[in-house]
Regions:
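Active-site phosphate-binding and catalytic loops of NTP-dependent enzymes
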Residues: 45-51
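Eukaryote-biased recognition of intrinsically disordered, low-complexity regulatory segments
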Residues: 1-22
Length: 233
């Protein structure tokens, strides 16, 4: 297949503003968009900058805006993308260079929700904290998050309010709020009940469409909201 790949480029050392550059490529229908980016970097322009790691949809490193939607470049097939493909950096986060964005703010919000198991008490049998299949199911969906930022950077509330904690942080808070073994339930709900927490969600559902892991992000936000209301009585 002959492919026309348009990439929004930006070099802070040379450019005043981002601009589009077009590359002619030949690819197989089964190739991924990441393969096209590799072609450009390896054979046409070694200055092209982007982030990637596992190339198997597990690490979340190569999330970017492809044909107008947030996707993982390593998962999106050329046959689905078409012969004219546009690629640009994620929205709402600072652009470092080309397709590379600054994830520090995103990760700060993630860390702020205490995304780890807090369980200081001694288990009943002194060995393990048992959990039934039903208890595990409560957070099964949100445990799939790979921190690609596709959901958060697809959110129009996040675009206009950088203080909003964002869908990804709420998803990871949900994962531990719903965990029967965790003992920081109230602390996380207090964080989520902040003015820039769950109440900022406007149920646009962009986050659900963007998630490459199929997480129902909006439902997770609703469930955290319900927990806050239940706690308040």
């Amino acid at each position: 297949m002959d492919i026309e790949l348009r990439i929004k480029r930006f070099n802070p050392e040379a450019d005043d503003a981002p601009h589009w550059e077009t590359y002619a490529l030949v690819a197989e229908p089964s190739d991924r968009v990441l393969d096209l980016l590799h072609q450009v970097k390896w054979y046409q322009d070694g200055t092209l900058t982007f982030r990637r790691s596992c190339a198997h949809g597990v690490c979340g490193s190569d999330a970017m805006l492809i044909n107008g939607r947030n996707r993982l470049a390593c998962e999106y097939l050329v046959r689905d993308a078409g012969t004219r493909i546009s690629v640009e950096a994620l929205k709402g986060v600072p652009m470092v260079k080309d397709l590379l964005v600054d994830m520090d703010g995103f990760m700060d919000k993630y860390r702020a929700v205490m995304p780890f198991l807090v369980s200081d008490s001694v288990p009943d049998d002194g060995k393990e904290r048992r959990q039934s299949p039903a208890e595990r199911q409560r957070y099964d969906d949100t445990s799939k998050c790979i921190l690609c930022a596709a959901c958060t950077t697809a959110c129009p509330v996040f675009w206009t309010n950088p203080d909003y904690v964002g869908p990804a942080a709420i998803v990871n808070a949900h994962r531990f709020i719903m965990d029967s073994r965790d003992e920081a339930h109230e602390e996380r709900l207090e964080i989520m009940a902040d003015a820039d927490g769950v109440w900022r969600c406007r149920t646009v559902f962009n986050c659900v469409e963007a998630c490459p892991r199929g997480i129902n992000v909006t439902r997770a936000i609703f469930e955290v909201t319900a927990e806050i209301e239940r706690q308040r009585g």
